[in-house]
Amino acid sequence: MELERSRRTAAAMAALCLLAASAYIWRDKDEEAVMASAPAAVAASGDWGLSFQTEGAAPVGNATAEHLGQYDAYYLGDTGKKVIYLTFDCGYENGYTEQILDALKKHNAPAAFFVVGNMIETAPDIIRRMAAEGHIVGNHTFHHPDMSRIADQAAFREELESLANLYKETTGQELPRYYRPPRGKYSEENLKQAQALGYKTVFWSLAYVDWYTDNQPTADQAYAKLLPRIHDGAIVLLHSTSRTNAEILDALLTKWEDMGYTFASLEELPECR
């Protein structure tokens, strides 16, 4: 058991070394250009992307909410309410997650933390705190691979179930059935596979380039992305490894509250229609 765990940990660490280099679809190009070029497609496959067309309005995704909905997949919440769904991707512990949890607790704001195997193995107390404070801990796979390249159902299931099993070993609880594809890479078959395993796939409708730990945005740069683009029903993606996110989260939540927004759990997402 321990030998297998060590092997999995080594594999996870190797995969995480690629995380900063491959992050999300905006990595290799200018953020604005990639966002603006994301088409309003019907097909659900490829790299998740967004096009922000009107300030304060929900962006257009490269798959429609209706098409994603048939697979219990989301990129928007309730767009009829001034509500925000906070989510954090946690590839590893970088020393900022507890500060983020403190800010969430201060604002009584629920969040979802999408974690990988390394995060649970190296920071079990933080994982237990997330659960104890009422946050969702979601499945970001064990090794953080490109899931769009995994067509085999057994291999896909193993990535999710090994993470779910580790979470249960660590907390004594079942892992909530929310899944986020690593780096936003997915295929329509993946969405079907996740749905068959009882998962809701959660993309996002607002994010910014916050994952380069050695090139963090300033607070003003973060606000310039996150404030004008916020919209009703936003599913916000932030990274828990970001120093800037930890430093501004309290003030950011206050600013959103001053704009009339409240915060909701993914458990409150509207049923897919």
Range-by-range predicted roles:
Residues A63, Y96, P145-T171, K185-D232, ...:
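Alpha-helical scaffold elements lining the catalytic groove of polysaccharide deacetylases
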Residues G49-A151, A155, E159-K168, L175-P176, ...:
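Active-site beta->alpha N-cap acidic-glycine motif
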Residues Q99-I100, D125-R129, N190-Q193, I248-L252:
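A short acidic, amphipathic alpha-helical/loop segment
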Residues P181:
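Conserved strand-turn element in the central/C-terminal portion of the radical SAM core barrel
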Residues I136-H143, G184, L238-T241:
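Histidine-centered catalytic micro-motifs
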Residues M1-I84, D102-A111, D232-R273:
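Terminal accessory/targeting
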